[in-house]
Amino acid sequence: MADPRALVIGGTGPTGPFVVEGLHERGFDVTILHGGQHEYEFAVPNVRHIHEDPHFQEPLERGIGSQTFDLVVAQYGRLRIIAEVFKGRTERLVAVGGATGIFAPDTDPRWGATGKPALFADSSTVYVREPGEDGANKIGFRMVEAMEALFENHTAGAYSATYIGYPVNYGPRSPGPYDWSVIRRVLDGRRSIVVADGGIKIDSRVFTANAAAAVLLAIDEPEIAAGKRYSVADDNAFTMRQRIEFIASHLGHEFEFVDMPYELAWPCYPLWRHVRGHRLTLSTLIRDELDYRDPVAPDAAMATTVDWLLANRPAPDGELERQIGDPFDYEREDQLIARWRDAREALGTVESPLPVQGHQYRHPKAPGEAWKPGPS
């Protein structure tokens, strides 16, 4: 009996090799279809390559010809095109997309009077429903369109579909490696680093090996995963300041943090990804249904990421640095820091008129003693 056939669309990026090698270990005959811009030496033999661009229908159809597959894992390209092309060509389609970008913006009234929560259930269906003025939400709108087309085909019986959403990836080979904003400043000998609002912003992220493990779990459980949308994020999320401190410590460096309001703190915008507030997602469903757990702990994941970037440094003003959008303009950063310090000095000492904050509950020293302010 022939081995089951799997097609991985992508396969050479940050999570692809883990998925390809995991499929091989599960007995699949694996083919990858990708644009050919990046190659990878897999640790398993006999992985066939098709070089076509999966962003467009004609090249994708040309690449697969009359072939059919037991499983397609779509990690790259345009999902709305892939979802259509593989109708009747595969039994299962496991698609990877976004975990946070599919949800409506903060101002959408469907979130209710309290607005969009900083953290909300991964079962939420408050999706982006219009591109927005000047196309501000166009990418999220297209992502939702593609995801819903995928599930429409699932309902129609074209194939069994599963969608797995990632927040921003980090790890070896990741595009837009935002941690490089910190690493390069260490390498360049910067002593000061600008942070906004105390560095308390938190983004959900997923380490590449952890993300791939989630995909493989969905592949292992076809009946449970059928028709499901999962989100997967690392179990622990850290503040920006914690991330900066970890990188600096790992490299034997110490920064002086220059804290200022977000409106002024433009040097940190690339690391903050130009959003002041948190970007968080839960991954409750995949943990409950598929028993997903992070295979790689956060300290090991972050250390691996830093070490890989040290060994594979992005070229100055090259593709990766342009994806990050950090100019590393230290002259203007120093000017901003100097102006901020001057402004703080001119403001002088600000005295606080606040009283001692009392605990909410009574801490009586004798029976019947009433609540009173002050420490317990």
Task: State the predicted function of each range.
Residues G98-E145, E152-A156:
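Active-site "gating" loop of Rossmann-like NAD(P)-dependent oxidoreductase/epimerase domains
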Residues A146-R173:
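Conserved beta-loop-beta element that borders a ligand/cofactor-binding pocket
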Residues L33-Q37:
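N-terminal Rossmann-fold cofactor-binding loop
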Residues P4-R26:
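N-terminal Rossmann NAD(P)H-binding glycine-rich loop of SDR-like oxidoreductase domains
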Residues T15, A211, V215, V232, ...:
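Non-catalytic, hydrophobic alpha-helical segments
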Residues I183-I193, K201-F238, E245:
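Alpha-helical substrate-binding/gating segment
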Residues I50-Q75, A83-E84:
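Conserved Rossmann-fold cofactor-binding substructure of NAD(P)-dependent oxidoreductases
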Residues A218-H278, S283, A303-T304, P314-S376:
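Mid/C-terminal beta-alpha module of Rossmann-like enzyme folds, strongest
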